[in-house]
């Protein structure tokens, strides 16, 4: 109840305002809530003891909270109790007979995920949640992010693993093992068995959202083929045999020593994974350098990260992106280059789509016509469909427009950049060979589109650049990264929320694995092995002098 207003508005849809006086516990509200719950229960299966959501059902909890002890209405007449289940989705079940049409799932799909796969069809008592055009979940636009399942207060939307295994009994906080977004999850367990993965609401990267990979693609954790004990074999033709960790370590160490004795200290190396933790990667590179005595260590991130590491460190002094993921919520113009976040980084894509629905502009530079060119309630302001391999030509032609039309942020350049270096760069990009007209034949992008995109990025407010493997996994990757950094500096789009140059990593710890010294030419912290002082410091720290 709100003083000065009629009725009893819902708290979840009523904005706060200055001076508002709100009462949440009054006899009138208690009677109203009890009556509403009674009506819900009158059209709801009372199979709580055998329901998959027993003990984890908000309808059950609220019935007890409002003191509902009896239901005056029977099941006579029309009801929804005989509605069937939709089991088409491989990860969760939709039981329409338990739906209270609260609309939470619809709002989650629209406001959080941004897919708009769900709607309420029908009117009045006949209202029901529908996926797609009155079809099932599998045939609808649903991307199985799990937002609807998490939002559901009853057993209407339930994970199949919970139906099969029951409710989890303990929780472990963890990080998703897939893409570079780094979503935080609660692994909900029964003993050592994972029952479900629930996105952690306080996760800095995902803020309680998830994608199909992190939410449901964790079957490997429980799979019978997962090895939980060390095994060894004398030769490739022998059968594997399980042994203790002590025996396995001694066996591996002996074989490695034997190889070095016979073939020299450079005969052994290691490749780290960007799916490993910082601690694991650090120990591997330290073992290679301190124990094996060489720098034969590398990482799978070399393919996707090296151009970013080299380009951004040359431009800004650090190999990391300039912003966190929350920064996109303050962007006014988003320049998306060589990335398809709806497929590769879905949780970040949802945050980006939310900002775009709020009015931010989007410029896409990609050979492919990705989803974000035009999707539900979103249409890119510019789509520069370049020919593969012409990334640098496009970024230079964008810079040409900005410099020659006087759109550069001269105050930012004077205060924060190197004016001498800017003069050299601006003279280069101002040349006719870098103009949008000269580049059109090479890039395939019409000059008018380049001009319009450049003007929008330079004058549209906070401009943020996001890029993916379409930029870095390329022979011109480092040059392109530096080109984007130059564009950000020239327009003053650095040093605050909503701007920056931001790589979208391919795996969950690309940045960390490189920070830990996984490259043969760099020690932890990107300190070069050719520097005498750096080598001396690590030799003393690791006791290898």
Language model regions located:
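Short basic, glycine-rich beta-strand/loop surfaces that mediate nucleic-acid
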Residues: 1-2, 138, 317, 395
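Fe-S ferredoxin-like electron-transfer domains
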Residues: 2-144, 149-175, 190-193, 228
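Catalytic alpha/large subunits of respiratory electron-transfer oxidoreductases
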Residues: 45, 163-545
């Amino acid at each position: 109840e709100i003083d000065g207003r009629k009725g009893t508005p819902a708290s979840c849809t009523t904005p706060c305002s200055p001076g508002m006086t709100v009462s949440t516990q009054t006899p009138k509200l208690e009677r109203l809530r009890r009556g509403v719950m009674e009506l819900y229960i009158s059209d709801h299966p009372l199979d709580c003891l055998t329901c998959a959501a027993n003990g984890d059902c908000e309808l059950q909890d609220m019935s007890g909270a409002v003191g509902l002890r009896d239901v005056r209405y029977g099941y006579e007449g029309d009801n929804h109790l005989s509605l069937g289940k939709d089991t088409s989705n491989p990860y969760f079940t939709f039981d329409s007979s338990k739906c209270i049409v609260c609309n939470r799932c619809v709002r989650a799909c629209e406001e959080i995920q941004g897919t708009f796969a769900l709607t309420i069809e029908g009117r009045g008592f006949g209202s029901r949640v529908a996926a797609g055009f009155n079809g099932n979940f599998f045939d609808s636009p649903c991307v199985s992010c799990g937002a609807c399942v998490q939002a559901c207060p009853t057993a209407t939307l339930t994970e199949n693993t919970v139906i099969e295994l029951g409710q989890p009994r303990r929780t472990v906080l963890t990080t998703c093992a897939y893409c570079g977004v780094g979503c935080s999850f609660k692994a909900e367990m029964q003993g050592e068995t994972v029952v479900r993965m629930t996105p952690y609401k306080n996760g800095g990267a995902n803020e309680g959202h998830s994608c199909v990979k992190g939410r449901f693609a964790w079957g490997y954790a429980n799979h019978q083929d997962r090895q939980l004990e060390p095994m060894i074999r004398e030769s490739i033709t022998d059968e594997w045999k399980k042994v203790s960790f002590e025996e396995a370590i001694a066996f591996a160490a002996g074989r490695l020593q034997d190889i070095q004795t016979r073939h020299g200290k450079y005969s052994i190396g290691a490749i780290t994974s960007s799916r490993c933790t910082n601690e694991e990667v650090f120990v591997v590179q330290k073992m290679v350098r301190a124990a094996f005595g060489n720098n034969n260590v590398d990482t799978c991130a070399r393919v996707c990260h090296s151009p970013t590491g080299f380009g951004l460190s040359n431009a800004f002094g650090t190999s990391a992106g300039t912003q966190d993921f929350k920064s996109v919520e303050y962007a006014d113009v988003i320049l998306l280059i060589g990335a398809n976040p709806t497929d590769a980084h879905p949780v970040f894509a949802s945050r980006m789509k939310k900002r775009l629905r709020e009015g931010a502009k989007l410029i896409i530079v990609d050979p492919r016509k990705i989803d974000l060119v035009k999707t539900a309630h979103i249409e890119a302001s510019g789509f520069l469909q370049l020919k593969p391999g012409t990334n640098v030509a496009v970024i230079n032609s964008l810079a040409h427009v900005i410099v020659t039309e006087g759109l550069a942020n001269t105050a930012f350049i004077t205060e924060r950049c190197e004016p001498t270096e800017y003069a050299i760069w601006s003279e280069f990009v101002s040349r006719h060979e870098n103009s949008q007209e000269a580049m059109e034949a090479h890039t395939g992008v019409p000059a008018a589109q380049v001009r319009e995109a450049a003007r929008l990025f330079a004058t549209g407010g906070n401009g943020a650049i996001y890029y993916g493997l379409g930029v870095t996994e390329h022979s011109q990757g480092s040059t392109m990264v530096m080109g984007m950094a130059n564009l950000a500096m020239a327009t003053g789009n650095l040093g605050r929320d909503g701007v920056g140059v931001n790589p979208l990593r391919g795996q969950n710890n690309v940045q960390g694995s490189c920070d830990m010294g996984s490259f043969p030419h760099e020690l932890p912290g990107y300190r070069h092995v050719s520097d005498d002082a750096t080598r001396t410091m690590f030799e003393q720290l690791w006791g290898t002098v």
